[in-house]
Amino acid sequence: MEDRTRTYLKGRFGDYYARARMDTPPAANRREWGHIPWSAGSTTMVRHQSLLELGTLDDFLHRTAPKHVYFSAARFNDPGATTMDQKDWQSADLIFDLDADHLPGVNPDTTSYADMLTACKTELQTLLEFIDDDFNFDETQVVFSGGRGYHVHVRDEQVRSLDSAARREIVDYIRAIDLNIETLIETQSNHGTTQRILKHRGGWGQRIHKRLVELIETLQASDDTEALERLQSFEGIGTGRAETILGQIQNNPEAIHAGNLEAGGAGIRILADALAQTAFEAETAPIDEPVTTDTNRLIRLPGSLHGGSGLLVTPLDREEIPSFHPLEHAIADRFRGRDIQIRITDSGVTTFDGETFDITEGNKTVEECLGIFLMARGRAEKVTE
């Protein structure tokens, strides 16, 4: 990035912060604050600052116009101290991070930025199902990171005291790491006999049970030949076992709906095992483990600008998420309504503000919000007006 471009972006970020009013997180004065300046080649964070040392946050942001702004998930007794021991850790929000670069099926070299963001929002919906249905967290905040993904802040009191190991268990559960169907089965006594029942009132057991019931309903709607062929497509199920399973489905489907994995012999258990592996692969949320397990993590400030895109770090109400499109709705109004001149250095197809177009190298006059986006992403430089 050329000096002229860097100076321009810092100036315009400062103009944005001159009018913006930031909402601070709970217990803001007990959190560590950090920022990355617009210095040439700088990726080093200035940290170990308390809100008291910064002064008024809005004034600090206007004066320094940082490239990136962060605050700690943790709450400390002395957040401005230079060592973690001196800070005296008290608690920390539980943070989930989804980054498009880490999503299955996304290649940062070939997948467009717009497509990465779309894929990431799909994964966000999956993550929120875990947060709401499996963990029943109440105090949550969803934030578009301004870059390639989303953050979810969980501030329920019972999670703030969790150490890194406990947070890793949450990550492992969501990502189905080392998850075994045996942990989802309980033994029940029924008229003197024992039955192995799939727990299906929530969590992973419910996900597997749903797939099992859907398969059973598909087999019920098929003729016998099709149903037997479908059953034999599962490893470990031959002709005889397929016939036994189909007979159970036709004569006693209620037992399977109740989660009885011993109905009809070992066949239903084999089906459940196979469907569990499918669920573990398809229904996880690819959260970034180091972010969640780090109890001292610094995370982006909602309402601030992301120096790598010029987009807003945007807090979202749940009802806003389905219709939220970052490349339209995370554009700062401050950068709309005027044109600037830039020099395109990296040509190619670009999606921005509801339009997709092919930009070519050379000097261009564009709306400022697009110009800032391209410059921040390293695809353009500022030229003299």
Swiss-Prot record:
<keyword id="KW-0479">Metal-binding</keyword>
<dbReference type="GO" id="GO:0003899">
    <property type="term" value="F:DNA-directed RNA polymerase activity"/>
</dbReference>
<keyword id="KW-0639">Primosome</keyword>
<comment type="subunit">
    <text>Heterodimer of a small subunit (PriS) and a large subunit (PriL).</text>
</comment>
<keyword id="KW-0808">Transferase</keyword>
<comment type="function">
    <text>Catalytic subunit of DNA primase, an RNA polymerase that catalyzes the synthesis of short RNA molecules used as primers for DNA polymerase during DNA replication. The small subunit contains the primase catalytic core and has DNA synthesis activity on its own. Binding to the large subunit stabilizes and modulates the activity, increasing the rate of DNA synthesis while decreasing the length of the DNA fragments, and conferring RNA synthesis capability. The DNA polymerase activity may enable DNA primase to also catalyze primer extension after primer synthesis. May also play a role in DNA repair.</text>
</comment>
<keyword id="KW-0240">DNA-directed RNA polymerase</keyword>
<dbReference type="InterPro" id="IPR002755">
    <property type="entry name" value="DNA_primase_S"/>
</dbReference>
<protein>
    <recommendedName>
        <fullName>DNA primase small subunit PriS</fullName>
        <ecNumber>2.7.7.-</ecNumber>
    </recommendedName>
</protein>
<keyword id="KW-0235">DNA replication</keyword>
<keyword id="KW-0804">Transcription</keyword>
<dbReference type="GO" id="GO:0006269">
    <property type="term" value="P:DNA replication, synthesis of primer"/>
</dbReference>
<feature type="active site">
    <location>
        <position position="97"/>
    </location>
</feature>
<feature type="active site">
    <location>
        <position position="288"/>
    </location>
</feature>
<keyword id="KW-0460">Magnesium</keyword>
<dbReference type="GO" id="GO:0046872">
    <property type="term" value="F:metal ion binding"/>
</dbReference>
<keyword id="KW-0548">Nucleotidyltransferase</keyword>
<dbReference type="InterPro" id="IPR014052">
    <property type="entry name" value="DNA_primase_ssu_euk/arc"/>
</dbReference>
<dbReference type="InterPro" id="IPR023639">
    <property type="entry name" value="DNA_primase_ssu_PriS"/>
</dbReference>
<dbReference type="GO" id="GO:0000428">
    <property type="term" value="C:DNA-directed RNA polymerase complex"/>
</dbReference>
<dbReference type="GO" id="GO:1990077">
    <property type="term" value="C:primosome complex"/>
</dbReference>
<dbReference type="Pfam" id="PF01896">
    <property type="entry name" value="DNA_primase_S"/>
</dbReference>
<feature type="active site">
    <location>
        <position position="99"/>
    </location>
</feature>
<keyword id="KW-0464">Manganese</keyword>
<comment type="similarity">
    <text>Belongs to the eukaryotic-type primase small subunit family.</text>
</comment>
